[in-house]
């Protein structure tokens, strides 16, 4: 068979296009045009704008970017989104490009609590342009004019909001997602700022959902939310933006974090009491464990302080933005209730700072108590070690004074006891009796001699714990005396 015509092959390739097919739907597919950069998110400056009907904050403003590398292969990059980008069920590291191939599975965001799959799931395909046309989602060019008037009325510029530091990879999700007990981060504040640009009539359902989620936010958040609801203006006017929801959400999450911090403090206090009861035994294992607990407690304290300080700084920035927004509203609409709400939020902020200071002092007290307990345990260990050394020293004195032969001044070797109850080395007393048949100590006549196995065994056991020089010297003496005895 002949080779295919290059011109025909090029025409076939030109009629085909890469696309992200949305799973479970025959529409809202995202076309990847060759030579272009495709951006996806909920903002206005992206190629494809995704607005979630269930959880508006699931998709970040500029969630991800798809473009071709120098080899012409398509890549996807997570643009530091809050809920992440998943390629074949694995979360991508932010700001790193990953190559995609035909058949790959792409997921934007995370599944909601009541569902198994995420709202936006796609499959990478390559099809004819004509067959793709009915299924493609419209590009953001069609929605630019629609939201143009709305963007001009916003008091917070999108550039200023986008400059807030975005979080890296995290398991944090929106209030309806699984594992939503973690505190909200700056990305959630962006979403609240967008929601604030809508009329108050549209904000009422959101406030109702916040009331429903009060139960899991802790007692501090439950007491804060009704106060904020009372401060909302009774008269609803079109296009009255407010960032109070973002402040409320940040307060709730910060208070929840403070409750966890207090619980951990109570647990550490109980642990200190238990250690005090058991520290009298003074084992080295306890010393090591207490040192490790102390280091863990210090690192936890520093981490909690850093997180709380970051949230306080973000809260102060939000308050500054709300104050600027409030000034604009007073000039246009004259609503003084928002100013009262800001003052109340500042009072809550001061209370939060006081609570943080109290928590810090409590942690410092716990650390000081652990330091004192550790010092006492070390002192007890030193005392036990000193007692052991004293016993060993006393044992050496006994060996030197009571278990030495008076003739050779060495520890008994094959000890024998005479009829006068004095003990000597068997070799030494035999040599002595060649000159005199009387005890070298009491001068009584030697009538009998008895081997003392008890003394031999006792001396052998004690010599095993002495230095190697002493053991070597004793072995040499035993060999020499046995050799002389054979002669």
Curated annotation (Swiss-Prot):
A zinc finger (RING-type) spans 405-443. The modification Phosphoserine is found at residue 157. Autoubiquitinated through 'Lys-48' and 'Lys-63' of ubiquitin. 'Lys-63' polyubiquitination is mediated by UBE2N. 'Lys-29'-type polyubiquitination is also observed, but it doesn't require its own functional RING-type zinc finger. Pathway: Protein modification; protein ubiquitination. PANTHER family: E3 UBIQUITIN-PROTEIN LIGASE RNF8. Its EC number is 2.3.2.27. GO terms for biological process: cell division; DNA damage response; DNA repair-dependent chromatin remodeling; double-strand break repair; double-strand break repair via nonhomologous end joining; epigenetic regulation of gene expression; isotype switching; negative regulation of transcription elongation by RNA polymerase II. It comes from the Eukaryota. This is E3 ubiquitin-protein ligase RNF8. CDD domains: FHA_RNF8, RING-HC_RNF8. Residues 38-92 form the FHA domain. It comes from Rattus norvegicus. Homodimer. Forms a E2-E3 ubiquitin ligase complex composed of the RNF8 homodimer and a E2 heterodimer of UBE2N and UBE2V2. Interacts with class III E2s, including UBE2E1, UBE2E2, and UBE2E3 and with UBE2N. Interacts with RXRA. Interacts (via FHA domain) with phosphorylated HERC2 (via C-terminus). Interacts with PIWIL1; leading to sequester RNF8 in the cytoplasm. Interacts with WRAP53/TCAB1. Its main location: nucleus. It is found in: Nucleus; Cytoplasm; Midbody; Chromosome, Telomere. It catalyses: S-ubiquitinyl-[E2 ubiquitin-conjugating enzyme]-L-cysteine + [acceptor protein]-L-lysine = [E2 ubiquitin-conjugating enzyme]-L-cysteine + N(6)-ubiquitinyl-[acceptor protein]-L-lysine. One of its GO terms (molecular function) is histone binding. Residues 135-195 are annotated as: Disordered. GO terms for cellular component: chromosome, telomeric region; cytoplasm; cytosol; midbody; nucleus; site of double-strand break; ubiquitin ligase complex.
